[in-house]
Swiss-Prot record:
GO BP: any one term: translation
Protein name, UniProt field: Small ribosomal subunit protein uS14
Organism of origin: Leptothrix cholodnii (strain ATCC 51168 / LMG 8142 / SP-6)
Subunit composition and interactions: Part of the 30S ribosomal subunit. Contacts proteins S3 and S10.
Domain of life from the UniProt record: Bacteria
Coiled-coil blocks: none
Cystine connections: none
InterPro entries per the UniProt record, alphabetical: Ribosomal_uS14 (IPR001209), Ribosomal_uS14_bac/plastid (IPR023036)
Length: 101
């Protein structure tokens, strides 16, 4: 089980990313738009740098919904590999069966 502080830190980052998502997208679009002047694009780059560090989506880490484990998580289930295995063997995940051939 991950430390509670790490799980809460990740939740805090998710809130910050959601809060600044619109502004982040607008600034990125301005920077990538070749029709804008160089000064406008440079100003957008500076404004993007002024956003909080944790407002960047790349800083988010997928964690297991049960244990908080940061590695080996499956997006489809939102769970870590060990918990998927446990729940699948018990039959708690619909449609997931052990492979046999």
């Amino acid at each position: 089980m991950a430390k509670l502080s790490l799980i809460q830190r990740e939740e805090k980052r998710e809130k910050l990313v959601a809060k600044y998502a619109k502004k982040y997208a607008e600034l990125k679009a301005t920077i990538d738009d070749q029709s804008k002047s160089e000064e406008e694009r440079y100003a957008a780059r500076l404004a993007l740098q002024q956003l909080p560090r944790n407002a960047y989506p790349t800083r988010l880490r997928a964690r297991c919904g049960i244990t908080g484990r940061p590695r080996g998580t499956f997006r489809k289930f939102g769970l870590g590999r060990t918990k998927i295995r446990e729940l699948a063997f018990r039959g708690d995940i619909p449609g997931v069966v052990k492979a046999s051939w």
